[in-house]
Design a protein with these regions (language model features):
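Periplasmic/extracellular loop-to-transmembrane helix junction in inner-membrane transport proteins
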Residues: 27-72
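Transmembrane-helix boundary motif in ABC transporter permease subunits
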Residues: 69-99
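Generic hydrophobic transmembrane alpha-helix motif, especially the helices
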Residues: 100-136, 143-144
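Short cytoplasmic-facing helical segments at TM-TM junctions of multi-pass membrane proteins
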Residues: 140-182
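Hydrophobic alpha-helical transmembrane segments of polytopic membrane proteins
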Residues: 206-245
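Short cytosolic juxtamembrane segments of multi-pass membrane proteins
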Residues: 245-262
Length: 262
């Protein structure tokens, strides 16, 4: 499907979503604010200082700061653990069950335990978010490491490639699709946990604003904050991740009927 058709289908899906949203506001006006009410609240949020006399971009930046820092930590730790598990049978046999147990721990429990251990401040978030999302990255990279083609490694050794050169030119290119899958899953999970941390522990960030306006039952304003942060994530996906993925997978030939680049 070419970009024009994809753009049309995307626009159509957005219109359908907005239509369903408006229909929901008609059916249940006490629970779902209308599109126009949310748009009005959005304009107010974008132009008027909120609690503690802070503009919207302060809260978006604080949430993005925690999310991106913890995402980077999780990607490094998860990639190292995943590659180690996928390339070492002893480690895989010893630690695989612990990874699945780690995945089963509820994120909310991790947030509360971090708060008890460290305190009700931002440090708890910087601990809780990596703990919660690192196993998802590790699981993706583990599967990627298990699918590495050993013949490529043998060929690199035959031509005298060193360990670093093999890692950079043979292993990493094969793991790129799994790395981007890890980034997307970590981002989608990480922002939810970041908002939980802010809602329960902090007095700044998008999560705090959600809780603040939920407590006041200002649903239109709460929805406007959701629109702001979803827009931020869409920019990250299509403005950063998609172009980067296309660039890093440009060397891969397209299989018939399959698009490897977005």
């Amino acid at each position: 499907m070419d970009r024009t058709k994809r753009g049309l289908w995307t626009a159509l899906s957005v219109l359908v979503l907005v239509g369903l949203w408006q229909l929901g506001s008609v059916v249940a006006p006490e629970s779902i604010p209308s599109v126009l009410a949310t748009a009005g609240a959005l304009i107010t949020v974008l132009t008027t200082p909120g609690p503690y006399d802070r503009m919207f971009y302060y809260h978006v930046w604080k949430t993005a700061e925690m999310l991106l820092i913890t995402l980077g930590i999780s990607l490094v730790l998860g990639t190292v653990v995943g590659i180690a598990l996928g390339t070492d049978e002893t480690l895989e046999s010893s630690l695989s069950s612990w990874i699945y147990a780690w995945l089963a721990i509820p994120s909310l429990v991790i947030v509360f335990v971090a708060a008890v251990l460290i305190g009700f401040d931002a440090r708890s978030g910087y601990l809780a978010v990596p703990i919660a999302i690192t196993p998802f990255v590790a699981l993706n990279m583990w599967e990627g490491a298990r699918s590495l083609d050993p013949q490529l490694g043998e060929m690199a050794e035959f031509f005298g490639a060193g360990r670093y050169q093999q890692f950079r030119a043979v292993i990493i290119p094969q793991l790129v699709p799994f790395l981007f899958a890890s980034i997307r899953s970590a981002l989608s999970i990480g922002w939810k946990i970041t908002l939980l941390v802010e809602a329960f522990l902090l007095t700044r960030g998008v999560g705090f604003m959600f809780r603040n306006y939920f407590d006041q039952y200002e649903l239109a304003t709460m929805m406007s904050w959701l629109v702001i942060f979803v827009a931020f994530l869409v920019v990250i996906e299509y403005g950063v991740l998609a172009p980067l993925r296309r660039r890093m997978t440009a060397w891969r030939p397209d299989a018939e009927g399959v698009r490897l680049s977005e």
